[in-house]
């Protein structure tokens, strides 16, 4: 992606992103990540999907933000990606203006933009064919409300987000997307097993204990056909297309560290950076980085071409997004591992950015869709 493609507010947004980058660098020292999210609310960065109409520009701006912040903190950037993919998928899905979902969406976006809201997501299945198998969160209609109960193992931005957006099974069949305030006694957060490694993401388990959600905050989905729900697949595709950005940002930071190492390291009276062997290894890292990034940009273009009701385009964008996730996260991890071999013990020195990234980069391939799900899908779709 060319950095000049920044939409209608290039100067402001580029300045905001640089400021956010510098702020996050400072926060990394104290690890008071709540302060960073408070700062982020004062910018337009979290609300890009509410402020742009062009789908590809929305994608590019969200990706660039996540990529830049990922150079400093994978956990923080991953958490923001959870906010982005839900917001972007809802904001850009081509609802017909005659549908009630269109107007519910407009009200929701205006609320998010006006109140500077952060949203978190949980409970959505992120594979193509398994929409009906998500039984973790259930909802039952009761007059003008739905009563929601169940549990999801992971949710980022727990305690930071103002609202939760999640998908649940309906007791009478089908699925629906729910929008609920997070400050509610019927929502309980508990710590996950990640410990301090993903501290900045505020990832916790979430339990719904008969949470009452008004029907006005619910978008029902048509999941009765074999194709399942377009909106869920579209939402899933946004997630896959964006989730590599934090990891590729971190990989780029590591490549910069390798270049700096080559300039400083002396071998037989010459800089390491002058050796053909070093340049060959460095070139391989950059090839992997740029190749993965190009796949991500292709996923963004596929999202922009989607038309409601077009199964071929839906499948194409889903596959483009999954491929970008698979190769993006794997290439990022490979870059970091190869950099460790090049830099040796200096790479793992305590309190260095390379050591921090080395501990965080492994989470990329583990995020949905996992390798086993991706390979299972493509084994049936040659």
Residue spans of the language-model regions?
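Glycine-rich beta->alpha junctions and the first turn(s) of the following alpha-helix
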Residues: 195-289
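Glycine-rich phosphate/cofactor-binding loops in nucleotide/flavin-utilizing enzymes
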Residues: 341-382
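Alpha-helical scaffold segments that form or flank carboxylate-/histidine-based iron centers
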Residues: 238-240, 273-285, 316-327, 355-363
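Glycine-rich flavin
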Residues: 32-151, 156
């Amino acid at each position: 992606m060319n950095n000049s493609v920044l939409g209608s507010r290039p100067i402001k947004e580029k300045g905001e992103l640089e400021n956010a980058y510098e702020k996050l660098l400072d926060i990394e020292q104290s690890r008071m990540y709540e302060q960073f999210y408070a700062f982020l609310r004062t910018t337009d960065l979290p609300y890009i999907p509410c402020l742009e109409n062009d789908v590809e520009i929305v994608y590019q701006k969200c990706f660039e933000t996540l990529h830049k912040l990922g150079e400093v903190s994978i956990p923080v950037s991953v958490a923001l990606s959870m906010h982005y993919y839900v917001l972007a998928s809802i904001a850009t899905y081509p609802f017909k203006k005659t549908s009630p979902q269109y107007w519910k969406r407009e009200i929701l976006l205006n609320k998010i933009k006006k109140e500077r809201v952060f949203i978190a997501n949980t409970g959505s299945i992120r594979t193509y064919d398994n929409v009906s198998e998500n039984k973790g969160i259930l909802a039952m209609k009761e007059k003008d409300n739905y009563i929601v109960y169940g549990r999801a193992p992971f949710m980022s931005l727990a305690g930071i987000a103002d609202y939760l957006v999640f998908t649940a099974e309906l007791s009478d069949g089908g699925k629906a997307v729910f929008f609920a305030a997070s400050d509610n006694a019927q929502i309980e957060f508990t710590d996950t097993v990640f410990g301090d490694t993903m501290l900045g993401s505020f990832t916790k388990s979430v339990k719904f204990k008969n949470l009452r959600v008004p029907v006005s905050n619910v978008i029902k989905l048509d999941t009765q056909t074999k194709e399942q729900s377009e909106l869920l697949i579209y939402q899933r595709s946004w997630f896959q297309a964006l989730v590599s950005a934090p990891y590729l940002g971190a990989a780029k930071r590591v490549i910069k560290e390798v270049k700096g190492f080559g300039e400083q390291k002396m071998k037989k009276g010459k800089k390491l950076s002058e050796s053909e062997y070093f340049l060959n290894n460095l070139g391989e890292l950059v090839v992997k980085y740029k190749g993965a990034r190009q796949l991500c940009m292709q996923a963004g273009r596929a999202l922009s071409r989607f038309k409601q009701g077009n199964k071929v385009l839906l499948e194409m964008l889903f596959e483009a997004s999954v491929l970008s996730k698979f190769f993006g996260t794997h290439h990022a991890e490979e870059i970091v591992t190869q950099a460790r071999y090049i830099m040796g013990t200096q790479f793992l020195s305590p309190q260095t950015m390379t050591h921090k990234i080395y501990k965080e980069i492994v989470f990329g391939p583990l995020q949905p869709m996992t390798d086993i799900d991706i390979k299972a899908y493509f084994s049936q779709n040659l």
